[in-house]
Amino acid sequence: MPKNSKVTQREHSSEHVTESVADLLALEEPVDYKQSVLNVAGEAGGKQKAVEEELDAEDRPAWNSKLQYILAQIGFSVGLGNIWRFPYLCQKNGGGAYLVPYLVLLIIIGIPLFFLELAVGQRIRRGSIGVWHYICPRLGGIGFSSCIVCLFVGLYYNVIIGWSIFYFFKSFQYPLPWSECPVVRNGSVAVVEAECEKSSATTYFWYREALDISDSISESGGLNWKMTLCLLVAWSIVGMAVVKGIQSSGKVMYFSSLFPYVVLACFLVRGLLLRGAVDGILHMFTPKLDKMLDPQVWREAATQVFFALGLGFGGVIAFSSYNKQDNNCHFDAALVSFINFFTSVLATLVVFAVLGFKANIMNEKCVVENAEKILGYLNTNVLSRDLIPPHVNFSHLTTKDYMEMYNVIMTVKEDQFSALGLDPCLLEDELDKSVQGTGLAFIAFTEAMTHFPASPFWSVMFFLMLINLGLGSMIGTMAGITTPIIDTFKVPKEMFTVGCCVFAFLVGLLFVQRSGNYFVTMFDDYSATLPLTLIVILENIAVAWIYGTKKFMQELTEMLGFRPYRFYFYMWKFVSPLCMAVLTTASIIQLGVTPPGYSAWIKEEAAERYLYFPNWAMALLITLIVVATLPIPVVFVLRHFHLLSDGSNTLSVSYKKGRMMKDISNLEENDETRFILSKVPSEAPSPMPTHRSYLGPGSTSPLETSGNPNGRYGSGYLLASTPESEL
């Protein structure tokens, strides 16, 4: 009796099999089924076709442990956006008030859709292309669109890692190279670089020394050789990590996923000990409740939830496809989502502690500069000394004393006050000066670290953390490209991965020009937002409305051993698609109301200026969006008009946990012997499907079905509910 005798008995039950077929199956004797040959008639001479019987579950690589898998998912979902985008949005949208819409949308959009992607990847054990082709062939373009979006994101994301590598190596100096403005000699006279003097040392180092940025996107300025080398190093590291496979990548994840938390914890402890850190923390948690009613806040919170978990990229599906079938992906979805949120809050605490310290430093600098102005006015008798409170000591002027003096002068000299050019030096104003995106990491943080004791050490730790966070996300992004392509087209993994990295490096040279930062902005803000939203909406529709939410819940029950909460049924069926549709509409309206643009650094002004993209850049932007979404309608149309095979000529029946994978080509509906292994018997259960999708009630024809002969989900995709059936 085979080890899976109960399954064999059930599958061989005469309830769904004709008597003659059952008799033939009863004659099977145990042999090595891997050598069996399948007779496929219908061709001249009754052609014999050898069938490869290797089990998919055994052939596919698997994680060495559950911990490796969890760390990989955390490494993919927790990225650079948690360090700079979430804190920026929190600061911009009302501090603590922003956390409320974020949490609500995380629960009704983030966790359900994250669970959905984990489940389909684990159940079907394929990358994004294979998964969506399996569920609904006409929506198979979803997987290709995911791959394209991953490619677009990977192109510029690795550039940011390259920037971090550049700063990492520059951190092994004391003092840090961005702590002071460079001095330029004009003959015998030494003067401070004008661009740096007008801005700041950290701003100058970022724009001039690191990026050597041009004044607009239209001025390419040639390649920045320093960043080109850093980009080459970044792609080399990513390529080696992906080529080694998930087992080796899993080992890397032990370090790359955990190290950032060590650094963030150290930064938080150190940050809380800084003067003014409490001011920053209080500013973060002081809610501005009026912001909660602003639709823009909800739109940005939804977008952040969407990107934070990596939905639609295919990386989540790729990683979960290497899991065991009985893995509790429901627990994984909740755990990874919570850790992602916790990381965002932890990073925000660190950012606001550092910004509170920086705000106090800048506020004190403001007080000193304005006190010097007042002293000048006193010496020139523009102001009377009677306006200065007697207890004020200019040698040790506090912020409180300055504010008292400022208010007196403003009251007495009301008519001439504006001409004095005095600044109130309010701490709140400094805290409200939001720094977005790369500026937060490469300007605000670097400036704060120049005031840290042992600043090179903290700088090395910070940029090593950014590199690790970036690499964790990049490995998942590359998995979203390589896994579905390798699964679908069976290309050699090593050659394909190396080819992808070389191609991405060459295209990535666009981002290491002097104008490269503007292209990074274009790709980051526009190339992925709309395509990813559309991808996730269609993923949700494919599972909840085409495959069927009830059927999907039943499949999850069989896979997990328990039935998921009813909550997910309503989220997948109604709430999540509706919210995503509203988000898409809002994004399109926002794009139409506000023409796309970017912040350009003007050298002569030493300041940023918002510019609109030129026509050719707009054409490129639209092309990126179209290219990312084009596979979806193209595949749908081709399969709808039968111009592209949807797999109807090959029926693939997967038997997990010891069952065979059989490919039976060109089956004739009325010849039941087409399902029987040739005269060489097999120990393994017969690959004959026994569900009524194949054998209708009272039917003697193996492929005769009631209703649509091609099934509900496309030609050749009749779903068999065997005990371990595919999704």
UniProtKB/Swiss-Prot annotation:
Positions of transmembrane segments: 70-90, 96-116, 148-168, 223-243, 254-274, 301-321, 335-355, 461-481, 491-511, 528-548, 574-594, 618-638
Gene source species: Homo sapiens (Human)
InterPro entries: Na/ntran_symport (IPR000175), Neutral_aa_SLC6 (IPR002438), SNS_sf (IPR037272)
UniProt entry tagged with the keyword Cell inner membrane: no
Coiled coil spans: none
Extracellular side, ranges: 91-95, 169-222, 275-300, 356-460, 512-527, 595-617
Reported function: Synaptic vesicle transporter with apparent selectivity for neutral amino acids. The transport is sodium-coupled but chloride-independent, likely driven by the proton electrochemical gradient generated by vacuolar H(+)-ATPase in an overall electrogenic mechanism. May contribute to the synaptic uptake of neurotransmitter precursors in a process coupled in part to vesicle exocytosis.
Membrane topology, from the record: Multi-pass membrane protein
GO aspect biological process, one term: protein catabolic process
Protein name (Swiss-Prot/TrEMBL): Sodium-dependent neutral amino acid transporter SLC6A17
Record PTM Phosphotyrosine, positions in chain: 377
Compositional bias ranges of the Polar residues kind: 698-709
Compartment(s) where it occurs, according to its Swiss-Prot or TrEMBL record: Cytoplasmic vesicle, Secretory vesicle, Synaptic vesicle membrane; Postsynapse; Presynapse
